[in-house]
Amino acid sequence: MKKVYHYIIHYVRTYLLLELLAGLWLTVKYFFRKKITVQFPEEQTPLSPRFRGLLALRRYPNGEERCIACKLCEAVCPALAITIESEQREDGSRRTTRYDIDMFKCINCGLCEESCPVDSIVVTPIHHYHISERGQNIMTKEKLLAVGDLMETQLAADRAADEKYR
């Protein structure tokens, strides 16, 4: 009797394709559920307030750049993506002559932002940028300052909202 039972079970599993029907049932079940896919260019999910996107350099309200060339961000960068050159000014303070970030090396860890004593380098919520030619991966001081000027109002508001956590 056990042998006949074994043959019946083998027949049902082999010829009725129960595994295939179970897989098809799972597919049909999900086919009629609400879709969770986001059509990216047209629709976007909301970003976290602490999202780390494109880097920027900020200025003081009088227009002077904030960076004091302490090179802490260059020292703390684990990917060695930041290159800084500086010189002394007439008044004795240091300012950067070159501030480059290689975006191919940058891992968006945010350590440069945390180490900056004057809030000069910051991360922005910009995540739509592309590189179409060789050499565009280097964010120069001018590009970084331009991004900072563009985003200054939002960056200041984000800093004010995040102040109690810093």
From Swiss-Prot:
The molecule here is called NADH-quinone oxidoreductase subunit I
Concerning NCBIfam families, the annotation shows:
NuoI (TIGR01971), PRK05888.1-4 (NF004538)
Q: How does it sit in the membrane?
A: Peripheral membrane protein
Q: Which UniProt keywords apply?
A: 4Fe-4S, Cell inner membrane, Cell membrane, Iron, Iron-sulfur, Membrane, Metal-binding, NAD, Quinone, Repeat, Translocase, Ubiquinone
What does the Swiss-Prot or TrEMBL cofactor note state? Binds 2 [4Fe-4S] clusters per subunit.
* PROSITE patterns cross-referenced by the UniProt entry: 4FE4S_FER_1, 4FE4S_FER_2
Instruction: State the InterPro entries in the record.
Output: 4Fe4S_Fe-S-bd (IPR017896), 4Fe4S_Fe_S_CS (IPR017900), NADH_quinone_OxRdtase_chainI (IPR010226)
- What Pfam families does the database record attribute to this sequence? Fer4_7
In terms of domain of life, where is this protein from? Answer: Bacteria
Assembly, per entry: NDH-1 is composed of 14 different subunits. Subunits NuoA, H, J, K, L, M, N constitute the membrane sector of the complex.
Amino acids binding [4Fe-4S] cluster 1 = C67, C70, C73, C116
Q: Extract one GO molecular function annotation from the record.
A: NADH:ubiquinone reductase (non-electrogenic) activity
Task: Assign the protein's first listed, main location to one coarse class.
Answer: membrane
Cofactors (names): [4Fe-4S] cluster
Instruction: List the catalytic activities from the record.
Output: a quinone + NADH + 5 H(+)(in) = a quinol + NAD(+) + 4 H(+)(out)
